[in-house]
C-alpha cells in the first residue's frame, strides 16, 4: 500500500521520542500549527526524490532549527551517511564539492 507524506509523518511521530534529534529539546505537540514543520528531510526531496518517503531520511527538529540545520553535527553526520548510501545504491560516484 502506498503511503503519503502525512501518513509517514504520523508513523514517525508514533515511533520516535518527541524531542529534536538535533538539540534534544522537546518538540511542539501534535495539533500545533507548526507541527508538520518538525519533520526535516535530510536529503532534499527535489534532489533525492526516491528518499522523499524514506523514514531514514527524516529527522525530527524544531521549526527554528530547520533553517539552521547545517550547524548541527547530528544533521551533517546523517546527511553524509545517507549520501553515501544513496550513491552506493546507484553505483554512481559521489563527488563532495
Segments and roles (model prediction):
Residues 1-24, 49-52:
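Short, charged surface segments at domain edges that flank catalytic/cofactor-binding sites
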Residues 1-13, 42-44, 62-63, 75:
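Extended interaction regions within the primary functional domain
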Residues 4, 8, 32, 81, ...:
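Alpha-helical structural elements
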Residues 20, 27, 76-77:
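Residue-level detector of short coil/turn "hinge" positions at structural boundaries
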Residues 23-25, 64-65:
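Short Cys/His-rich metal-coordination motifs, predominantly Zn2+-binding knuckles/fingers
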Residues 25-58:
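Histidine-centered nuclease catalytic patch
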Residues 46-60, 64-97:
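Polybasic, low-complexity binding patches
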Amino acid at each position: 500500500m502506498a503511503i503519503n507524506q502525512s501518513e509517514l509523518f504520523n508513523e514517525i511521530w508514533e515511533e520516535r521520542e518527541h524531542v529534536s534529534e538535533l538539540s534534544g529539546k522537546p518538540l511542539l505537540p501534535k495539533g500545533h500549527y507548526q507541527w508538520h514543520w518538525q519533520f526535516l528531510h535530510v536529503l532534499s526531496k527535489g534532489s533525492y526524490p526516491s528518499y522523499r518517503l524514506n523514514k531514514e531520511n527524516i529527522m525530527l527538529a524544531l521549526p527554528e532549527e530547520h533553517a539552521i540545520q547545517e550547524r548541527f553535527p547530528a544533521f551533517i553526520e546523517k546527511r553524509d551517511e545517507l549520501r553515501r548510501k544513496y550513491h552506493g545504491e546507484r553505483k554512481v560516484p559521489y563527488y563532495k564539492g
